Amino acid sequence: MDTTNFEDIRNEWIEQGQGHVFNWFDKLSNEEKLNFENDIRKINVKEVNKDYKNVLLNKDEQKIMKYEHFENVMTLNKIKEQDKKKWEDIGYELISKGEVAVLLLAGGQATRLGTTFPKGFYDVGLPSKKSLFQLQAERIYRLQQLVSERYNGSYDQDSKPIQWYIMTSEATHSETIKFFENKNYFGLKKSAFFFFSQAMIPCITPEDGKIISESGSKLSLSPNGNGGLFKALSTSGAIDDMRKKGIKYVTQYCVDNILINMADPVFVGYMHDQSADCGAKVVSKSDPKEPVGVMALNGDGKPFVLEYSEIDEQSKFKKDQNGQLVFNYAHICINAFSFDFLDRIAKNHLDHLKYHVAFKKIPSAHPISGERQSPSSPNGWKLEKFIFDVFPFSKKMVCLEIERSKEFSPLKNCGGMNLPDSPETCLRDISNLHKSFIENSGGKIDSSNSTICEVSPLVSLNGENLKNFVNDKTFILPIEINQNLNN
């Protein structure tokens, strides 16, 4: 904890040209002063000023001048079965040794979904009413069972569980920890969890880099983007924890993907087989105009994500000799990193990750009263780092193209509005996937009354273990197939 005299801190802020945030300090209550002081102590004001100057210097540099097609991609449904099995075997072996971890980005609140709780709490409407967090936890639980079955019980999931690193934000940290505690970690080992929070940084004015006060007693702070992960891994001790536990590969995903394939053995095995230190799962663009970032190579031949706003019109529609879009592979924030890569980023490259600017409407304090005001137009910058900005530092990067219908259905928008990426589309997609599990195992589906179908991850992770129960049977929807196998 910072024990520097608060008056010294105040003087430093004044010297750095940020003394205006204290304009209302003398009028605050004792409790407000204490909270304000705590906020101030978390911020390195010199670093804020440095970041602002760097943003100004880098604005032109961030315009991509040259880019090429990224070729190092394998398509999952076109891979030879022998290769897929080889990669799966490698992945399972790495998991059995306790060398694979999962890393969850869980800093988001479900504000666009009409709530203020962490997005991982959300229930999209499955018969079981399971939250996103529970679905993910049960997938890890089932994967550990499959590893144990594969190694005839010799794998000890108590001594070598799949480690789960969960990055929260200031808004979600304590609630997330309490949620898992109250649920007894869904049967997983408490020692397998490592919770840590990403940093909050001040919003600033574009014209002069002044820190914005949300009110007289509170600074306007926002999370530093998913690229803040790498510094948070270092400062929280997560990197040291990974080193101590012998982690070799870390698979990363976002909390809102209801179809996430946790610690996918094929993906990990593919990376290991290719001696890659960085990997990403990608999907084919649904349309040339789909507003997503795509994998590409920069002018130095290094992998990076070409954002939709950066790609020219001709390149959006450009096709190869097979009729496929040249810039076709959309980055969906499902990545994997070798531990050595993460360690190298934390030690050598944190300062090389540049901030990106978002011009936003940011509540600010009335200049006299200090009361919170909501602007009618954008008035400030939020600075964010992006997770994919580490890709150019990779020595070898590979991508695995997956099917959206099996592995990617994000929850972004509220329900009842006929919007994409909503609770309704998530429920539709997971139901369709689970219906395919039943049908591929010889069962039949009667969807005359409903389209909702749920197969518990504790029963089947990817369609395995169902044939003896569902073969030649008809299931009337809605249905939940759980551990009792009697619904």
UniProtKB/Swiss-Prot annotation:
Motif Substrate binding per UniProt: ranges: 105-108, 307-308
Pathway recorded for this protein: Nucleotide-sugar biosynthesis; UDP-N-acetyl-alpha-D-glucosamine biosynthesis; UDP-N-acetyl-alpha-D-glucosamine from N-acetyl-alpha-D-glucosamine 1-phosphate: step 1/1
Keyword Transferase applies: yes
Positions of UTP binding: 105-108, 119, 198, 225, 256, 382
GO molecular-function term, one example from the UniProt record: UDP-N-acetylglucosamine diphosphorylase activity
Catalytic activity: N-acetyl-alpha-D-glucosamine 1-phosphate + UTP + H(+) = UDP-N-acetyl-alpha-D-glucosamine + diphosphate
Alphabetical list of Pfam families matching this protein: UDPGP (PF01704)
Coiled-coil features, chain-numbered ranges: none
GO cellular component entries: cytoplasm
UniProt keywords, alphabetically: Cytoplasm, Nucleotidyltransferase, Transferase
Family membership noted in the UniProt record: Belongs to the UDPGP type 1 family.
Protein name per its UniProtKB record: Probable UDP-N-acetylglucosamine pyrophosphorylase
Species name: Dictyostelium discoideum (Social amoeba)
